[in-house]
């Protein structure tokens, strides 16, 4: 293993210490709890939506979450190993046949709904 990959693996271990990252895929509904720092105050803000894309690039891994807020679609991209993410919760598992769900941007209402796969929280 070359030095860069070894260094990245060490950094990933350090960043995930004390946190559990669930095994989620595009189509799953997740709740991302973010640490927001405003001056001297620090608070946790939840962002819940459907994962429409995931990029697995070692320490630069990221995922995009889409939610509908006040009738408008909002997408936000998160770095998987960011220290600002306090936790990620898997809410629902979806059944999709694509790795990137960008087509959901053009759909509205029931057409944008994703079938749900039944799972137990213990088994994830």
From Swiss-Prot:
GO terms for molecular function: structural constituent of ribosome. It holds the Pfam family Ribosomal_L19. InterPro entries: Ribosomal_bL19 (IPR001857), Ribosomal_bL19_CS (IPR018257), Ribosomal_bL19_sf (IPR038657), Translation_prot_SH3-like_sf (IPR008991). GO terms for biological process: translation. GO terms for cellular component: cytosolic large ribosomal subunit. Keywords: Ribonucleoprotein, Ribosomal protein. Belongs to the bacterial ribosomal protein bL19 family. NCBIfam families: rplS_bact. HAMAP family: Ribosomal_bL19. This protein is located at the 30S-50S ribosomal subunit interface and may play a role in the structure and function of the aminoacyl-tRNA binding site. This is Large ribosomal subunit protein bL19. It comes from Orientia tsutsugamushi (strain Boryong) (Rickettsia tsutsugamushi). The gene is rplS.
């Amino acid at each position: 293993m070359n030095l860069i990959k070894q260094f990245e693996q060490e950094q990933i271990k350090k960043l995930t210490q004390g946190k559990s990252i669930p095994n989620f895929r595009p189509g799953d509904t997740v709740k991302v709890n973010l640490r927001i720092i405003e001056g001297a105050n620090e608070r946790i803000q939840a962002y819940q939506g459907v994962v429409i894309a995931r990029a697995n690039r070692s320490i630069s891994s990221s995922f995009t979450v889409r939610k509908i807020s006040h009738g408008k679609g909002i997408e936000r991209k998160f770095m998987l190993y960011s220290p600002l993410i306090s936790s990620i919760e898997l809410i629902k598992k979806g059944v999709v046949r694509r790795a990137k769900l960008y087509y959901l941007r053009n759909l509205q209402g029931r057409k944008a709904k994703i079938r749900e796969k039944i799972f137990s929280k213990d088994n994830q």
